[in-house]
């Protein structure tokens, strides 16, 4: 199930001034693993896409993983454009917030972070702070995982309902 339609529908409901053209909008993959999702959404919207390459230190292992030393952006100029970052999962959210910061540093306008699975394993404090600092506009995740009342109460959060699509799998 591709949640792209639900993400776009909910973004447009909350951003009536968004222009769906290549001069005003880009879709971003936060890493090479998410390219398929970003290409799918960008092609359906008829806009450009970009991606971040996670450069890792393969000589070190921390918590069972090679640490990321830099996010390298591959794509067109983002200045003044709205960004839709699409990924499969927000676990701690560190990568998503880092990508949003790098896009803001490049003078992106509004940033919408979309993820099928919003786990927020490190809590919401980092997202609260980033939102207060203007780092992003909205976070959208689907309801295929539990959403805490705390998350649902956030001004910046939008829940995208996939229940009717999940039900179709069982009928």
Where are the model-predicted features located?
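PRPP-associated nucleotide enzymes
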Residues: 1-169
């Amino acid at each position: 199930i591709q949640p792209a339609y639900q993400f776009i529908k909910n973004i447009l409901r909350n951003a009536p001034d968004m222009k769906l053209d290549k001069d005003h909008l880009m879709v971003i993959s936060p890493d090479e693993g998410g390219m398929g999702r970003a290409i799918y959404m960008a092609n359906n919207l008829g806009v450009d896409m970009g991606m971040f390459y996670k450069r890792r230190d393969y000589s070190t292992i921390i918590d069972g993983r090679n640490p990321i030393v830099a996010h390298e952006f591959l794509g067109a100029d983002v200045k003044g454009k709205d960004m839709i970052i699409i990924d499969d999962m927000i676990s701690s959210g560190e990568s998503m917030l880092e990508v949003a910061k790098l896009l803001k540093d490049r003078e992106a306008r509004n940033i919408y972070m979309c993820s099928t699975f919003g786990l927020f394993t490190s809590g919401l404090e980092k997202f609260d702070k980033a939102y207060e600092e203007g780092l992003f506009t909205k976070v959208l995740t689907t309801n295929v995982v539990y959403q805490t009342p705390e998350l649902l109460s956030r001004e910046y959060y939008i829940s995208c309902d996939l229940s009717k699509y999940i039900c179709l799998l069982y009928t």
